[in-house]
Amino acid sequence: VLVTIAYAIAGTMFGESVSNVMSYVLIMTLFGLSFNLQFGYAGMTSLGHAMYFGTGGYVLVALCQKAHMNVWLACLLTLVICFVFYTLCGIVCLKNNMMTFTFLSMGISLSVSVAVSKWMFMGGTVGLNCKVAPAWMNDYKVLYLFILAVVVVCTILIYMLSKSPFVMLLKGGRENEERLVFLGVNTHTLHTVVFVISGMFAAVAGMLFAFRNNGAYVASLDSGLSFEAIIMCVVGGASSFFGPVLGGLIVALVYNFLPQVTEYYQGFLGFFVLLIVYFMREGLLSPLSLIHI
């Protein structure tokens, strides 16, 4: 509650520029939490998580701009379309083992990114520029509070899910999948379900990004965004629920402020990740984060 109040004050009391940065931090936090459902709890390393983020925004903007649909109806239909698409992707990606899953997820993500960038109906390399937020969100403070509210609700839902028997099964499969199979658990279904749930939360983050940026753009499908999700979890700690929250905060601030200082900001981020992986292998917030030499 105190953190939510602090975010609300910081995003509404210090001007529009601060609000823009804080809204970006919130969206990246949700994106990182969604990825950690796969990466941290199930041990599934997806290299295509940007696809969920990007498709959420693109489908929403396309429905509003091309079909002239009411924004809230478009949001609902976007979730339905994403659910069907992610289910099909999950069935394909999880057909074999986790090694093939990693590369299949990357392949599908790259295919979607290239297809969207070449498809003029989706704006090509320019993207779709459309104000999807309703008129009552014209005030940046109202838009920020809306984004904050959605992220808080999603965070609570993910936290509740992380404490459920379902996630305990995911952790069991991560540690010893053969034992779960021996006990009669269908691990393929288990992994497909968490794949879809993770994608849905990432799609919500992408939809919020479309609200914030008044459109959907090819950068939201870029493979670099998938690696950012991994960095968030590695830096903060994939075994801690709030690890991706801290990781998302760090990554978002780096990408917002370091480019103003140096053009080599990605190198600094890479060096920081290297130090974390070498000295604190479980991340900054993990209870198992010990100094290793």
Protein language model annotation of sequence segments:
Residues 21-22, 26, 51, 72-80, ...:
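Hydrophobic alpha-helical transmembrane segments
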Residues 138-217:
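Helix-loop-helix "hairpin" substructures at the membrane interface of multi-pass membrane proteins
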Residues 1-5, 175, 182-189, 258-293:
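Cytosolic-side transmembrane-helix boundaries in multi-pass membrane proteins
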Residues 11-67, 92-101, 170-182, 186, ...:
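Single transmembrane alpha-helix segments in multi-pass membrane proteins
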Residues 108-139, 167, 282-287:
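Extracellular/periplasmic helix-loop junction at the C-terminal end of a transmembrane helix
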Residues 76, 192-274, 278-279:
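Transmembrane alpha-helical segments in multi-pass inner-membrane proteins
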Residues 28, 57-58, 82-83, 106-111, ...:
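Residue-level recognition of pore/gate-forming positions within transmembrane alpha-helices
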